[in-house]
């Protein structure tokens, strides 16, 4: 019963009915050894997204996060699109954790705000190398950053030096 209620609620949520209420009432028929299930569905009003907000992105620009959104502001709220947007943020690799919360707008019954809370993590790496060969001692260093300057672009810088050449 609970799984069926959740399925109906999620299906309605994908169609913009974010606050749908579904309750299943079983009726046991002992003579027939069966159970009748009656579902009472109150979809409520279709709900639209007023605003999408990001919290915790101190380094990454909002535009980088917004381009991953599949749920759009002004469109009706879809549970599937909200979760898909969360998954896309997680796959960027810039965050330790991504949480999403859908909040009703006070005083407006058919609108919600969606709040994504992210916890940024270091997305770069530093490396070095040392070697010896026909040209003598070779030294190398490199730095790579997957979210350069918060733009979501990748930056790689490296240098190798020995007695005969220097390469960047």
Task: Annotate each PLM feature.
Residues 148-154:
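Short loop/turn motifs that connect adjacent beta-strands in outer-membrane beta-barrel proteins
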Residues 1-137, 142, 156-167:
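Periplasmic polypeptide-binding modules associated with outer-membrane biogenesis and secretion
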